[in-house]
Amino acid sequence: MSIEQTLDELKQQLNYHAYRYYVEDSPELPDAEYDRMMQQLLSIESEHPELVTVDSPSQRVGGEALDGFTQIQHEIPMLSLDNAFSDEELEAFEKRMNDRLISKPVSLFCCEPKLDGLAVSLLYVDGKLVQAGTRGDGTTGENITENVRTIRCIPLTLQGEGWPTRLEVRGEVFMPKAGFEALNERALKRGEKPFANPRNAAAGSLRQLDSKITATRPLSFYAYSVGVIEGGELETSHYQRFVQLKSWGLPMCEETKQCHSLTEVKAYYKDILERRDALKYEIDGVVIKVDDIALQEQLGFVARAPRWAIAYKFPAQEELTVLNDVEFQVGRTGAITPVAKLEPVFVGGVTVSNATLHNADEIARLGVHIGDTVIIRRAGDVIPQIVSVVEARRPTDSKAIVYPIHCPVCGSNLERVEGEAVTRCGAGLVCQAQRKEALKHFVSRKALDVDGLGDKVVEQLVDKEMVETPADLFKLSAGLLTVLERMGPKSAQNVVDALNKAKATTLPRFLYSLGIREVGEATAANLAAHFYTLEAIQVATFEQLIEVSDVGDIVAKHVLNFFAEPHNKTVIEDLQEMGIHWPEIKALDESVPQPLAGKVVVLTGTLHKLKRNEAKAALQELGAKVTGSVSKKTDILFAGEAAGSKLAKAEELGVEVMNEEQLIELLN
């Protein structure tokens, strides 16, 4: 075989396996074998530079830095879309189309998520990528060919056969959530400013003059339409064109769907909106298009948008508002959290008047002042936060935020441990705020789960000095509780009954209820499974603690410090005297097969045939250590429906993923 033939064979193999990995998400080769083939290609091209072609996989690493971008002209304008913000506006869109159509009304739609990225045009000539450009103003864009070549999921050469001689593919370059988080983590470690959101990160990465930088960024791409078509024909259905493009190696959003009526379109919108936070990428709505290409051509365009497509936008997740004040709150472990008091603003479907500012470092990074106009962001159930300041609107009477040096509740000195971002009040349960939060945690659902003892009741109990420690809760009588607001005799008796019921608990729940720093539900369960008894945990050494799954140096130190504190020992003794108890944990019978012995597993997503706690218990019986987060230590992720960010991280780390059916098969 000649050098040229060897090179062609390597290119074909590398392109095929890149498609399997980046587009199909179904690799056939180990990473090491792919890397070996790539090194062989690079070695041949290094010895024979005259054989290097623009479609070679080696060109994905980036080339020489540019002085600036040249411009390209779009042969067919890249238009934007009109927006709809309600079902009524969507219905009006359908009516406008049907009023214009001479023949049949629209009966089939193609729907897809509206990705929050950067629109690009890819031009393939004879199956090879020869040009890539940004949308720009719709008629003129920037030539970003070298940067686009570095995006692994975009084919440099089309697969299969039947593609037109000249084919322009349009789509969105975006940065998946997991990649965005990893990129920002690396930036923070290097002391660099992180990106505000994935869209900014994608746009900034794509417009780098040095394509080697773009090559290091976790960019992806989904095709959504075509432009120029010469020397061939495509399907007459918009959806089938997607399928056609995918067969040629171009990525297609897996959420794209055909809908047979506007009722189905509305259901699709609602479904995507509900699953928005679980998707691997940021979206801000759904795009609805007439599926029939002939009808698209009949409907045509207005000045800036097609008549046959519309973007049904989600409620805004970012809005402008004014920072009126900052309130410093004290948490269960004494952490001081600055809370922004905002001019109320409707964002992400709710009215927001408070947002977290995290800590002193975040305030300094934002450079925010009281009185500033700020951009507030709310995503799903995430606490709203300020993402940036509009400094051009800063008023002359704005005030710098002064971080306190004393606890705003008890007046104790605040301290910041070296290496931590959080400032803390070290007064412990002497501080009323910490006492309230510790008691709320103690009775919470994942801890002792005391029904009827909500936050407001706990706050009243502390304010009236009826309770100081968790053990005091079990001394309360129905008669005493009736002095509280909205607490009649029946409600009071229900609380007492719930407290008595809560005395029978489990060791993991009890450990979690104590509020040891960094010891969540999963870590508490791992400690209990490892040591079997509370007494063994209390006397465990640092070396013994770090042998426990999910327990590192920091958590081990927190556990040691907690049990070394005399006050905490007294609280535990008092609770046991009040009748708190749990069943004995027996050591595992080594004669029983344990196929998951020593395996670290994570459960995520919605399970339909199993209850989460049942699945967790069954996995533990098989020897697995069930944790709450995905890391390099994770062996298996069991992913139910709408698995979200944990699934994305597992895929990024190469963790084995099993679905619910595989989980059931394993348990059986």
UniProtKB/Swiss-Prot annotation:
EC identifiers of the protein: 6.5.1.2
Keyword NAD appears in the UniProt entry: yes
Catalytic class of the enzyme: ligase
GO CC terms of this entry: cytosol
Keywords: DNA damage, DNA repair, DNA replication, Ligase, Magnesium, Manganese, Metal-binding, NAD, Zinc
One Gene Ontology MF term: DNA binding
Annotated Zn(2+) binding sites: C407, C410, C425, C431
GO BP terms in the entry: DNA repair; DNA replication
CDD domains assigned: BRCT_DNA_ligase_like, LIGANc
Keyword Magnesium attributed: yes
Catalytic activity annotation: NAD(+) + (deoxyribonucleotide)n-3'-hydroxyl + 5'-phospho-(deoxyribonucleotide)m = (deoxyribonucleotide)n+m + AMP + beta-nicotinamide D-nucleotide
One Pfam entry name: Nlig-Ia
Binding site for NAD(+): D31, A32, E33, Y34, D35, S80, L81, E112, R135, E172, K289, K313
Boundaries of every BRCT domain copy: 591-668
Cofactor(s) it depends on: Mg(2+); Mn(2+)
Active-site residue list: K114
Family to which this protein belongs: Belongs to the NAD-dependent DNA ligase family. LigA subfamily.
Entry function: DNA ligase that catalyzes the formation of phosphodiester linkages between 5'-phosphoryl and 3'-hydroxyl groups in double-stranded DNA using NAD as a coenzyme and as the energy source for the reaction. It is essential for DNA replication and repair of damaged DNA.
Protein name listed in UniProt: DNA ligase
Taxonomic lineage of the native organism: Bacteria, Pseudomonadati, Pseudomonadota, Gammaproteobacteria, Vibrionales
Gene this protein is translated from: ligA
